[in-house]
Amino acid sequence: SFLEVKLKECELAVEQGADEVDIVLALNAFLAGDYEAAADEIRQVRSCIDAVAARQGREVHLKVILETGLLRTPEAIANASFLAMEAGADFIKTSTGKVDVNATPAAAYVMCECIAKYYAATGKKIGFKPAGGISTAADALCYYSIVSTVLGKEWLNKDLFRFGVSRVANSLLAAVEQVTVSYF
């Protein structure tokens, strides 16, 4: 959608109490090599939500969805990760879950490596959220292990690491309780 529409949606969401805003990386611009346009859109959303939140005396977190299945290469995933972080993302997220290829361990590994490098260079911790195609306890454990190995145990908390699917909750609860559950 048009940037003006996105900004108005973000403004209204924060005015209504949203404490997090998710946006999708401007993929048309990014894939065309117009990295400045892609980064500028993130910066404008960041500025918008910060201004509204400041008037309310609070902070709002920005998650940028990279849609890694459409980026295809580790290099493109890394470039998008750094672009999003440098433009103001508090979290980077693999996907919307609405494309053919969503979260993959390979994409997660690349993104976590980028987060680690960004943290080493800036001291700012960026969160990671794999989303789409994660449906079993084994899937969740894979991503948990990647975050633990690449970023360290200090990232294993709700402020820096989350899953972007509710159906994995049933699988995890079933694994813990040793019975079939269907809460979500």
Regions found by a protein language model. Name each.
Residues 1-128, 135-166, 174-184:
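Alpha/beta enzyme core
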Residues 170:
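Metal-centered catalytic cores of metalloenzymes
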